[in-house]
């Protein structure tokens, strides 16, 4: 089962990476929807990373650091793309997605 979670995690990384470097057509009709999407994407990404490693994510500092570094690198790459822009609030939304998962996951796991 861990192999499936790892595959889903890898596919999510590829999808998020592709979406991060692809030009955006027009503006969003809903204000701040991009921040919500950043939050949800990293919440789900953190969930699948947690399922795909043997240790709980809170104990795996390396995995957590990699997620945060990945979020930062996406914004760094976007800074250098003429058709995208790097935003601190996008990075903060990514971090909030990670942190919300880390906060609620242990509570949900122990209740299940």
Task: Give, region by region, the residue ranges found by the protein language model.
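"…centered on the first transmembrane helix and the immediately adjacent amphipathic helix/loop
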Residues: 1-51, 63, 67
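Terminal transmembrane helix and immediately flanking juxtamembrane interfaces
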Residues: 1-22, 89-112
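Short helix-capping/hinge motifs at transmembrane helix termini and TM-loop junctions
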Residues: 22-23, 54, 82-83
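Interfacial helix-loop-helix junctions of multi-pass membrane proteins
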Residues: 29-35, 76-96
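Membrane-interfacial alpha-helical segments at the cytosolic side of multi-pass membrane proteins
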Residues: 41-55, 97-109
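Residues within alpha-helical transmembrane segments of multi-pass membrane proteins, especially transporters
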Residues: 48, 52, 69, 73, ...
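Membrane-embedded alpha-helical segments that form the functional core of polytopic membrane enzymes
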Residues: 57-72
């Amino acid at each position: 089962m861990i192999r499936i979670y790892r595959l889903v995690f890898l596919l999510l990384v590829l999808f998020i990476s592709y979406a991060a470097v692809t030009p955006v057509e027009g503006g969003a009709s809903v204000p701040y929807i991009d921040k919500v999407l950043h939050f949800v994407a990293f919440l789900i990404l953190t969930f699948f990373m947690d399922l795909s490693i043997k240790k709980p994510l809170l104990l795996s500092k390396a995995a957590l650091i990699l997620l945060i570094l990945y979020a930062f690198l996406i914004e760094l790459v976007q800074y250098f793309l003429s058709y995208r822009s790097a935003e601190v609030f996008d990075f903060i939304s990514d971090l909030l997605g990670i942190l919300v998962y880390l906060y609620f996951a242990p509570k949900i796991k122990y209740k299940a």
